[in-house]
Amino acid sequence: MRPQNARQIAGEPAAGPGPAATGPRWRLPYAPRPRFIQLETVTACPAHCPFCPQHEITRDPARMPDATWRRIVDQTRGLGITYRPFLTNEPFVDKRQPEITAYIKRNDPTARVEYNTNASLLTADLAARLLDAGVDIMRFSIDGFSPATYGPSRVGLDYAQVVANATRFLELWDAGGHRATTFTEVRMIEVPENAHEVGAYRAYWGPRCSEVVVTQLYQWPWTGQRREDVVRKPCLKVLDEMFFYTDGDATLCCWDVHGRAVVGNVHERSVLEIWDGHVMRQLRALLDDGRRDLITLCSRCNAYAGFDFSKFAATPGDDVVSGDTTGQ
């Protein structure tokens, strides 16, 4: 971690120092190496969703240099990584995605490529090129089953065009014999305004894709959470995932839009050195003790507030801060 980022990690306690440390309260099964890597290849998105802080991104460069994403991929070949070439952006703003997919898959049978897209830019040509390149997972975020319910949540996108693009991709996927090799998912965030459409949504998309998912809206960190309401629990997002910005900075979490928890840079240290480095170990130890209040980003995050972490309860003398999650 670079010195100028040190202040971004440790903050003041949210409600006093708490009891004296007697060892971790939990011991989460952190993977010895990442299993998922997200690459912010660009920072742009054509949508202006009211629930997403994407428009607040001011990172430079706006486009990840080829040398950066290739460096990350090359350093992790053969490790069974699922690469996600997007972060808080629409992946297909970046016209390099078929090339990126092909590069990741080249000479690495363990590598997988996954996209989550709003489908607004997914042309027939792009769909065919992605399938030919060997994309493994394609998830479509379509929050509604009518223009009236879709429009307010995905501001700036045309519902009919999005449905047409996603449907065409799925038709190419089906006709091309990709059902056995590429998983497809259509997902909707359920809100009161579209809850009445869930049945019709499932009926339409269910036969056309591998799976339909109806999920709930989550709250991004630092979007109104109060300091005194800090969640004193660990977090599942840091078990086996890494996240890289366009400049090669690695951050603790995919919800870190403003770079509050930068843990290293791939141009200064290798991917695995960052993953198993001192900063990450410190952060894992804090999270295992439920001390989100001492991590600036996490001190205003309520993710997993209702999750039961009891199965990860620490036992006396258990002081290992990294371990394989295989079989968990």
PLM ranges: what are they?
Residues 171-185, 203-229, 249-250, 254-308:
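C-terminal accessory region of radical SAM enzymes
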Residues 2-137, 148, 152, 156-164, ...:
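Conserved alpha-helical substructure of the radical SAM core
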Residues 44, 48, 234, 297:
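The −1 position to Zn-ligating cysteines in a subset of zinc-ribbon hairpins
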Residues 236-238:
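Short, small/polar residue-rich loop motifs at catalytic or cofactor-binding pockets
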Residues 40, 79-86, 104-114, 132-142, ...:
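Conserved C-terminal portion of the radical SAM core fold
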Residues 48, 246-249:
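Residue-level recognition of short loop/turn positions
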Residues 43, 89, 119-121, 144-146, ...:
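Short, flexible active-site-adjacent loop segments at beta-strand->alpha-helix junctions, enriched
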Residues 59-61, 92-94, 123, 146-149, ...:
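Short catalytic/ligand-binding loop motif for oxyanion handling, primarily in non-cytosolic enzymes
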